[in-house]
Amino acid sequence: MISINFNNFFKTLLLILIAFTLHGCDSILFNPHGIIAIQECSILLISFLIMLFVIIPVIFMTIYFSVKYRASNINAKYKPDWCDSKKIEIIVWTIPISIILFLAFVTWNYSHILDPKKSIISKYKPIKIDVVSLDWRWLFIYPEYHIATINEIMFPINRSIIFHITSNSVMNSFFIPSLGSQIYAMPGMMTTLNLMSNSPGKYKGISSNYSGKGFSNMKFTAISVLNIKDFENWIKKAQQSPKKLNKMSIFNIISLPNENHFIEYFSDVKKNLFYEIINQTYSKNKVFKH
């Protein structure tokens, strides 16, 4: 006969719950700083709360049945011929179907609301940033300011940011967890991502798709500033850089594989460099048009 020590069982369960509740890790996804990230966090919380309608009753019934029908309980009713219950059938089918339908509606609705190509409404003019995934760092081009940077971007809060993204090497993934969605960077193609920060700070940007030996350190910093003057000063700093990026030959040199690359600024960036990079990795018989 198997005996269960329920005191130890509940103590263990309590310790597990405490471990999950009081862990010291900072969950970036649940500490959003952008309007897209806030909505994505809402989806996770809604899905979690809905799934509790399944999880909590199952946990409760598991504990209840194990106690009620334990071998030592002589008062439990023994029904060897029981095989059907309309009430149970209704419950076990109605609740899961309702949950699936609700989650399907939420998914469909938010898939359209959070379309990465969908523009974010703002009273300020959006900032365009062209993003190129290199081995193993990120090149950012500000076409309107004729500057480029490696592993650092800056933008004001409450300003829509339009990212045009490609890769000069293998497929990669562009992701700023605090601000919102990740999107793939693919050679010979362009993807679009719209984000907006609603609070100042420095946010970690990463590659979330394995791309070789330098992948783990393929990080960048996204700086969101409250004062537009800080952004303008940062732009001027880059425009005064002695390093230029006005030729494809220069780009081909800086795009060579390199790990743990430092932050770098370039002035005098070649016009339409981003699209030339795409065409360089595209079919020779086709030209990418923008």
From Swiss-Prot:
Extracellular side: 25-42, 109-290
GO biological process: ATP synthesis coupled electron transport
Covalently lipidated residues, kind N-palmitoyl cysteine: C25
Topological relation to the membrane, as annotated: Multi-pass membrane protein
PROSITE patterns referenced in this protein's UniProt entry, alphabetically: COX2_CUA, COX2_TM
GO molecular function annotations of the record: copper ion binding; cytochrome bo3 ubiquinol oxidase activity; cytochrome-c oxidase activity; oxidoreductase activity, acting on diphenols and related substances as donors, oxygen as acceptor
Major localization listed first in the record, in broad terms: membrane
Cell location: Cell membrane
Record lipid sites (S-diacylglycerol cysteine): C25
InterPro entries listed in its UniProt record: CcO_II (IPR045187), CcO_II-like_C (IPR002429), COX_ARM (IPR010514), Cupredoxin (IPR008972), CuRO_UO_II (IPR034227), Cyt_c_oxidase_su2_TM_dom (IPR011759), Cyt_c_oxidase_su2_TM_sf (IPR036257), Cyt_o_ubiquinol_oxidase_su2 (IPR006333)
Cytoplasmic domain ranges by topology: 64-87
Signal peptide: 1-24
Keyword vocabulary terms for this entry: Cell membrane, Electron transport, Lipoprotein, Membrane, Oxidoreductase, Palmitate, Respiratory chain, Signal, Transmembrane, Transmembrane helix, Transport
Transmembrane region(s): 43-63, 88-108
GO cellular component: plasma membrane
Subunit structure: Heterooctamer of two A chains, two B chains, two C chains and two D chains.
Function, as annotated: Cytochrome bo(3) ubiquinol terminal oxidase is the component of the aerobic respiratory chain of E.coli that predominates when cells are grown at high aeration. Has proton pump activity across the membrane in addition to electron transfer, pumping 2 protons/electron.
PANTHER family on file: CYTOCHROME BO(3) UBIQUINOL OXIDASE SUBUNIT 2 (PTHR22888:SF18), CYTOCHROME C OXIDASE, SUBUNIT II (PTHR22888)
The family this protein is said to belong to: Belongs to the cytochrome c oxidase subunit 2 family.
Name this polypeptide is given: Cytochrome bo(3) ubiquinol oxidase subunit 2
Species, as recorded: Buchnera aphidicola subsp. Schizaphis graminum (strain Sg)
Encoding gene, per UniProt annotation: cyoA
